[in-house]
Amino acid sequence: MMIKMSISRLLFCSSLFLSGISVFAQELPYKQPNLPIEERVNDLLSRMTLEEKVTQIRHIHSWNIFNGQTLDTEKLKAFSKGMSWGFVEGFPLTGANCRKNMQLVQKFMVENTRLGIPVFTVAESLHGSVHEGSVIYPQNVALGSTFSPELAYRKAAMITKDLHAQGMHQVLAPCIDVVRDLRWGRVEESFGEDPILCGLFGIAEVKGYMDNGISPMLKHYGPHGNPLSGLNLASVECGLRDLHEVYLKPFEMVIRNTSVLAVMSTYNSWNRIPNSASHYLLTEVLRNQFGFKGYVYSDWGAIEMLKTLHYTAHNSEEAAMQAFT
């Protein structure tokens, strides 16, 4: 009887303790969905260490945490070091395995990190989700030749069905580069050579994604479609008039006509100044002139290339600082 009574008291006290933890967690402003977003964000930022803030603007690559088609929880635990990361992709995953694995990563981040911040799941989708089993659509250069932005809207809206089924929040599209050199190896990713056409198609695709619950990302910000000798990583050489009336015009159009919140900067350069470390492009033009309020996401390897390709940084730390331009 005494043992039963002790167990009953223990369970009762434990329930009070756990409910107290639950109430405390719910009282944290950043976890209360009924509060204004800005208030929740400010509260969360006030609780974060510098390292946690830095980790929020970093990306987990699939090779960091997956073994083939399976999430390696031990790898994820060692890699994350108790902190939630900003973004994760699973490009090698098939469509059938994608959602399950993304949910496992999300569950880990929410339950096994200090602040429980969810991660943003990211997919590539220039003309259909990159994951095996997804519907593939015509490349942008073919879509642009129809001169029908409505088709771009419908295409993006259809792609979101696959993205939702795969557990994705964000797509690395649309590509609105203006092509002016057919030797460039990425011509098919563009809607064409006309900046207004690229802008109109970009607006349509962004709305197609956003109207259906997926966050799009404009790319590639900075002159990109006319590199020297047609080489992908080479500098684009042009004056201010061509910069603004040709290469940046589609970005200005989309930013002014939609509520897009993500832009990807290129890994090449404009007049030999790296686009991903250009104060003029990223701050003076993108934010101050175009009024962009979202975040800039560097293209694959762009920050490291400040050290290995552009030679503007002596090491990775200096390269990262240059990106905060």
Predicted regions and their residues:
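Bacterial Sec-dependent N-terminal signal peptides
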Residues: 1-27
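Glycoside hydrolase catalytic-domain context in secreted enzymes
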Residues: 25-325
